[in-house]
Amino acid sequence: MWPDDLYRIMCRGNYIEILSAITNYNLHKHGANQCENESIPFTAIHQALQLRQIDIVKELIQQNPKLIYVTDHRRNSTLHTICITPNVMDIVISLTVDCDIILDIKYASIILNKHKLGEACIHVLKEGISGNEISYNKINKSIEYMKLIKERIQQDELLIAEMLLKKGIDVNAKDVYCRTPIHYAAERGNTKMVNLLLSYGADVNIITLDDLSVLEYAVDSKNIDTIKAIIDNRSNINKNDLSLLKAIRNTDLETSLLLYDSGFSVNSIDVYKNTPLHYAVQAPSLSRLVPKLLERGIDVNAKNIKGETPLYLMAKNGYDTENIRTLIMRGADVNAADSLYITPLHQASTLDRYKDTVITLLELGANVNARDYCDKTPIHYAAVRNNVVIINTLLDYGADIEALSQKIGTVLHFALYGTNPYMSVKTLIDRGANVNSKNKYLSTPLHYACKKNCKPEVIKMLLDNGADVNAINIRNQYPLLIALEYHGIVNILLHYGAELRDSRVLHKSLNSNMFSFRYIIAHICIQDFIRHDIRSEVNPLREIIQSDDTFKSIWLSCKEELKDISKIRINMFYSLDIFVISKNMNLLHHLVNNPIIKEINTYYFYNYGDRLKTSISLASNRHKILEKSRSKLDEILDSSGWSKLPPDIKLSILEFIGNTELRKICNR
């Protein structure tokens, strides 16, 4: 019989069957082969203890009193085993039972641990191995019953533990990890077991191989009664351990206050060089603890392994401006940077809801133009997250709107990297950002907008505000060449005067996006259509098109469609082709309300439909802005000579003004 065979019988057998199996169990033959990493003990006494088979334990000890001194492969004494709650999932997997049973036990243990009923998992394990139903729903509906099971198991554990202690078991015996039974009892938050072990002389100052004390294990249990028991029963407890730090790290306010009032050190440091204050400032629920830690003289400028100070972490979490003021008044360096030269203000600038934190830091001396390791200032952090509120706040306090970072560029470049750049880009432009600023690669914001496939309204906003549609960067790339994957942007760029500088636009668009490819050829066809009477000029791209059958077939299709468009008369002076070839919005807005234009279905034109649609939309938008501006000026200048001018003269005057400036008039 192997250890796992005996274990199965321990789970499902009756008293007689279990004792009979133990009698036939040959420890010397099979125990030596037991893998040390397995969760199943190889001794009968430890198996019985692990499964809380109390009657079996008593019988075995009665037959052989020396069994209480037997240890398992991890040097766990019998007292260790009764104090440890076994990991039922490791056990059930080791037993290689049916997958359905494994899943049932897994879900049941999740529910029980959620309700802090870990001890009841032992009952579930035995039920599952015995073949009894332990479904998720059954366990979920039996929480009260499981609480009774837990109480019964804990009572049995106390009886066995006291019996072992009375028979002389070493209360401070250490396992391979140098843990004593009270370490495990404290970790479980088993207050009654802790009190029992303390009454028999358990040493709470024994440190394990991972440098943890009994109290630190108890702190992780978050059981305040267990923690009080350890503190109250041992006057010689070491108060310089990490107990207070761990309680704060666990955001356990009750335990933190108890340990603080008990005099535990506030200057402890963990392996990451964090102090209790580092953790306290990150949890809103612990805000009342911050002034208490400061009263004890904790180092307010202590840096962890990343170079972060408590103020830095508080700014990063963006809450409690009162405690931010308190920290700074107590000497916290408002500009203390981490190992990457990121300051508290950089961190606070990441979210709109941190506005109060940003203002507090700025009012108390934060450098609004501090630079990190990539030369990014706080406004770069706000821009890349499209935080308009923070952008405006930083600008109000003197942030450099043209600050240039090493890699990406200016604030406007960063804004285009965000997920929703429209409002932040608009804000920056309205506040004077240069739309043609260049980074070290000579790329403009328009280059980035094309690369990031920004929405059409963002592209148009840049172009309407003077972005150079033909700017070339250090890699000899212009916006149109970068945007060829995105035909919607290509259409806009061509409409705003993008030049077809070389054959790359043809070959790259053919490989990237067929719609872009058609737009390019259609645009060349328009140029040829406009210049048909200029014999001296030869378009080199046209020669390339004529030399390739694929290119040529699309060219001919565009040419025929353009002829069809030119046959549609708008009035006696203009045909529909004016909306294809002209970029003069002051001309087109006079034509856009023509009934023929309103009836045009742009989807009918395969090659020029999108171009027509864009042109009509821009003309319509121009007309609306002009009319709205005229009405607004009529209100403002009601008593002046302006009101006496004919409407068409007013429009003619306003046509000299761009859309951006007209919008400012409309918004007055």
From Swiss-Prot:
The keyword GTP-binding does not apply. ANK repeats lie at residues 40-69, 144-173, 177-206, 210-239, 272-302, 306-336, 340-370, 374-403, 407-437, 441-471, 473-502, 571-602. SMART domains: ANK (SM00248). Keywords: ANK repeat, Repeat. PROSITE patterns: ANK_REP_REGION, ANK_REPEAT. The keyword Nucleus does not apply. Pfam families: Ank, Ank_2, PRANC. InterPro entries: Ankyrin_rpt, Ankyrin_rpt-contain_sf, PRANC_domain. This is Putative ankyrin repeat protein FPV244.
